[in-house]
């Protein structure tokens, strides 16, 4: 099941003839609860041409829950100048966002004392093998595969500010600006498999992002535009954690490797 919520308050203000101010604050919540994902794998026995359960470890159940809270706020200010027919404007603003996430998972496999009997290997897994009559002291039972490294908590604080100017020069319009971002991520994960061992790792980034946009108006319907900008792709919580997750596109379990910031 999934739950999402997004709420926002905004305001716009005109301060005299030359100044404008707008702001917003917001809160978002996201939840993904997977109470019982069941997955099994069978192989084809070429001699009997039957699908068989080769390993009970390939029949498993997973329970996971993810909660994320996001708080944000931003403010933008614009001042318009007037020097005859030349009317440039100055823009400045700030933005901040705080994210907190918690992810927990439990993983179970099936087992059978002294191994799964041959007669049961060819049974249809959901409709025959996993029936209540096959559970017991001398039959099927669930075995939890404890791995604390798959659980993590994290928080991320992003603070940004920018300044820019717009220069209307007849048919030519130039906008130039720069934005600064400070990003600090804390990931709390576990270093030991079989016991709680929370360890914090911090990732801090400071980046400048210049941008220039030049537009030349050819006529009322056409214009020629050149632009330059710089962006960044920072890793997400899951990408820097040691958590293992199942990728349905790859049909395999995936553990995140060390990720670097892409620019």
Where do the model's predicted regions map?
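Outer-membrane beta-barrel domain signature, strongest for Gram-negative TonB-dependent receptors
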Residues: 1-89
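Structural signature of Gram-negative outer-membrane beta-barrels, strongest in the C-terminal barrel
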Residues: 2-8, 26, 65-74, 80-263
């Amino acid at each position: 099941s999934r739950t999402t919520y997004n709420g926002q308050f905004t305001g716009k203000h005109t301060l005299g003839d030359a100044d404008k101010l707008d702001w917003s604050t917001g809160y978002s919540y996201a939840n993904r609860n997977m109470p019982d994902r069941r997955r099994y794998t069978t192989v084809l026995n070429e001699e009997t041409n039957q699908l068989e359960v080769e390993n009970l470890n390939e029949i498993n159940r997973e329970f996971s829950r993810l909660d994320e809270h996001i708080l944000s706020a931003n403010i933008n200010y614009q001042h318009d100048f007037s020097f005859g027919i030349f009317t440039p404007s100055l823009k400045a603003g700030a933005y901040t966002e705080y994210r907190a996430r918690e992810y927990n998972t439990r993983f179970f496999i099936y087992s059978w004392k002294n191994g799964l009997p041959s007669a049961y290997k060819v049974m249809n897994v959901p409709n025959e093998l996993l029936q209540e009559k096959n559970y017991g002291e001398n039959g099927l039972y669930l075995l939890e595969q404890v791995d604390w490294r798959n659980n993590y908590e994290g928080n991320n604080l992003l603070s940004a500010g920018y300044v820019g100017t717009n220069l209307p020069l007849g048919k030519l319009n130039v906008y130039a600006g720069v934005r600064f971002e400070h990003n600090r991520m804390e990931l709390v994960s576990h270093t030991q498999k079989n016991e709680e061992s929370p360890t914090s790792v911090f990732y801090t980034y400071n980046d400048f992002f210049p941008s220039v946009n030049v537009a030349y108006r050819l006529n009322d319907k056409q214009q020629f535009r050149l632009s330059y900008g710089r962006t960044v792709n920072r890793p997400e919580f899951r990408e820097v954690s040691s958590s293992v997750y199942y990728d349905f596109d790859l049909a395999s379990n995936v553990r995140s490797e060390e990720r670097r910031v892409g620019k």
